[in-house]
């Protein structure tokens, strides 16, 4: 089974998103994190489906989720390393 590893930045991105949304709706915050992690697990099974982002880093790829967040990741032999979860409105 393909593995998903999260960098410290990616873990902090999830926590920041959860804390921001949980102020108003903890259930929605939980669902967002679940959706992002589910998308990362899908990417681990098919890591080449994301868009190549060589202008940012060699080997880096991005994937738009069904949420307002993009996943930036590096494909690995047996999965992916998630570098960041970034809101689409963020530079």
Write out the residue ranges for each language-model feature.
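Non-catalytic interaction surface on structured domains
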Residues: 1-3, 74
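A short catalytic or substrate-binding loop motif that flags glycine-/basic-rich loops and adjacent residues
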Residues: 64-66
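Generic alpha-helical hydrophobic packing signal
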Residues: 18, 62, 72-74
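Basic, Lys/Arg-enriched alpha-helical interface segments
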Residues: 3-60
């Amino acid at each position: 089974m393909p593995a998903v590893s999260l960098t410290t930045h990616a873990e902090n991105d999830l926590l920041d998103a959860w804390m921001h949304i949980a102020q108003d709706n903890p259930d929605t915050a939980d669902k967002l994190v679940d959706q992002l992690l589910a998308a990362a697990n899908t990417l681990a099974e098919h890591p080449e489906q994301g868009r190549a982002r060589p202008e940012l880093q060699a080997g880096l790829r991005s994937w738009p989720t069904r949420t307002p967040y993009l996943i930036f990741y590096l494909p690995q032999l047996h999965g992916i390393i998630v570098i960041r979860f970034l809101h689409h409105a963020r530079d």
